[in-house]
Amino acid sequence: MHIFKRNYTKFILLLLLSLFPKTILFAQENSLKTKYFTIYYAQDCSLAQLADRLHAASFLHIDIFPQQNNVQDIQSIVSDLFDSLYLEVSDIIDIHMYSFEGTIRIMPGREELREILGAYFKKVPNVASFYSHANNTIYFSWPDLTLGVLVHEMAHAIISHYFVVPPSTKVQEILAGYVEYSIRKKAGLQVVK
């Protein structure tokens, strides 16, 4: 009976998350629409910090924080950055889906991420990010979000939507790891071999 209640509770939580994702767990967040993603982020997540963390200047070839008064709109910079990274990931794995639309949720911390993961796993892993194919959403912990983590999860999203029968977990991890390596190298970041 206990197993039934636990599975029933998970089912109800997943159902509610898929029907009313913004109203249940994500009431204190902002959103940003890009060509390929709708990004929901915690109120304490600064878009300027996000652009800096993701090394926007490396991919958009702009000065994010100009010294003069011609400051660009940070929302358009972040939007362009996510779309540019999506296209870069697509180029690396040679999978191009221009009609792709996904969701990204940047959670305030790992505890909030663990709450969501509890709906998917009996034993909740302590991870910085997670891609859910079921609702086409990438989840991140704000303190742990880096360029490498973002493109790794983007690769999972692209791979999951391209193949009718998704590759094994090991193959997906190899491809996502290669994407992460390639992007970090292109951005001039330290590459772990």
What are these regions (language model features)?
Residues 33-73, 158:
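Acidic/histidine-rich, surface-exposed loop or edge segments in extracytoplasmic proteins
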Residues 68-83, 140-149, 165-170:
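Soluble non-cytosolic domains of exported or imported proteins
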Residues 148-161:
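Active-site recognition of the HExxH zinc-binding catalytic motif
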Residues 11-22:
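Bacterial N-terminal signal peptides
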Residues 25-29:
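Boundary at the C-terminal end of the N-terminal hydrophobic targeting segment
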Residues 2-12:
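Bacterial N-terminal signal peptides that target proteins for export
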Residues 166-193:
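Post-HExxH zinc-binding segment in Zn-dependent metallohydrolases
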